[in-house]
Amino acid sequence: MLSLHGLVRGHDLELGRDADTGGQVTYVVELARALGRSPAVERVDLLTRLVEDPRVSSDYARPVEELGPRARILRVPFGPRRYVRKEHLWGHLDHLVDRCLSLLGESVGLPHVLHSHYADAGYVGTQLSRILGIPLVHTGHSLGRVKRQRLLDAGRREAAIERQFNFRRRIAAEEETLEQASLVVASTVEEIERQWGSYENLRPRRALVIPPGIDTSRFSPPAGSNAPEGAEWIDRFLREPGKPMILALCRPAPKKNLARLVEAYATDAELRERANLVLVAGNRDDLRTSEPEERRVHSELLYLIDKYDLYGKVAFPKQHRPEDVAGLYRLATGRRGLFVNPALNEPFGLTLIEAAASGLPVVATRDGGPRDIVANCRNGLLFDPLDPKAIAAALKDALSDGRRWRQWSRNGIKGVREHYGWPAHVERYSKAVRRVLHRERKRLRRHVTSVRGATLPARLIEAGHVLVTDIDDTLLGDRESLHELLEWLRLRAPDVAFGIATGRTLPMALAILGEWGVPRPDLLVTSVGTEIHYGPSRMRDLAWTRHIRPLWRRASLADALSGLPGMTPQPAMKQGEFKLSYDIDPARLWPLERLQGHLRARGLHARLIRSQDRFLDVLPVRASKGLAIRHLAYRLGLPLERFLVAGDSGNDVEMLLGDTLGVVVGNHKPELKVLEGLDRVYFARASFAGGILEGIRHYGFASPVAAEVTP
């Protein structure tokens, strides 16, 4: 398992110490222990960051820590030695990938499964999975796209939150992880449908809800008439400590929405009269030396307490110990109080389960995991976290009926036992992983690669067939047949993905497609196969870019070709990072063999593609339309027989050869006559899109009959 940020150890978890040490740390430590106790699991290694910093315990500098039977923490150094927040780790993750490869290859041994937690570990897990061919399981915990939107909704400026949280990189990593993961474990249905559902690469069939468990030996109702635990360090803040206690326990993070909770309490006289408010939001010493985010949260809470003169009604202790938490829940239960979680978004809500196991009813945000928890446990109410009046109303309602409060208390204890125990979690998890190993292990090992690929949209991944066509004089040229082809594609979605392969640059390709009313393709192979982009967002395939880059010396090639007869560079808008394009005079141009010799003599390597007796493109040796399509087939795991490709000119030759289903449209250039007679190249009589449709009918492409006979 990979969980990289925060302070991770097997005892005395410092939950709430900072924004990175929260529920995820509890989750991964307890999951590792629970899996280690299972006879179905040989060993569990929880890999995290080794931290050497006098400000934190030396426990976090120990390379190995045993957690229990067959489970341990492995700490790997990467990035700064000191403890830093997770947003500062992104630039060091590639180093961790290399160190993990060394660690797994030399001393630890290869695991059967990788399980990454959060986006940073997802990035590392994705690279390891690609390189080693090991299936990847991923748990998101908190999703960048969801958090970003919530902060915007709360009034934060986009530029400011991008600087603070680096959302672009985080979201890109999450998309990439979704592409690679064999299984996504979520805590709630809402997490899959509304949160992961906002990502392009979610494959719902690979997402599974397995609610986390809790250690029920730690969290239980108060026993009989014993004195309440922790009363003294809370009661010193309160004038009437015997009143019902509204407990909020969380990290000091803006998304936890504590300021709005205090506003709701402060502005409702009835609620203030009925109950006390207890805020346990991490630990603080000198605010001047706190982390900026924590300082802002703590300062705002102190300001609001003072602004509304809540002294004697609100307890806001500076410090608490991990062992105090269970006693806090029992104290609130003993005083017929409530646990409140006002977070803007709560991916799961582990503290809600801890409270429920302690017999404490809950009132929580309606956004995220609390919906499932309250539905399963039937022990409280939900509210709109953006509406202070709704928060206050829900709290008053929950306190208004003693009989219902007692029923909620009993329901919560029972519900946790039925739905949130670790043994049940491990059983479901183990079954899911066994299915992944059976289904995907061989396929993943065939796809071992050392490059870090670009994200593929789910639309492409889920397609069983792909139609790829040139643009000029192939797809475009006749509006009537184009309309018929587009309708054919619409009716066959999502089984058939649509792509273009063109000599045009990406902007030029999008412009001409827009002029003809063609919807944006799922795949765009542009600049004669030197660039690949995917989906509506036009994500670039960086793996392809890295693959074609070796031996490409663009400036040197341009210098070597400068001034040669019969070659005139095309305008800058038609050039590309990996493409030099020329208009040619066939009568004066050197033969291609002579041009290649000219370049090789200068230590230069390039692919030369001549088309229509008018153009010459100079490309990296690893690039072409045909190679780009084969790269895609490799990434998708689709046989080339599932690709129908159509073209009309010389730069289409490579993609028309081989096992693809080739279609040459009726208005093709004479240079394609060399392909006549080949088994899988069909020469259509119809022109433009009509020729593509004719080829589709010829092959029975994407028809039920074709699906039965095509391997």
Language-model regions: role of each:
Residues 461-480, 656:
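Asp-based phosphoryl-transfer active-site loop
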Residues 481-572, 667:
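Active-site phosphate-binding/coordination module
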Residues 116, 138, 186-187, 364, ...:
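Short beta-strand scaffold positions
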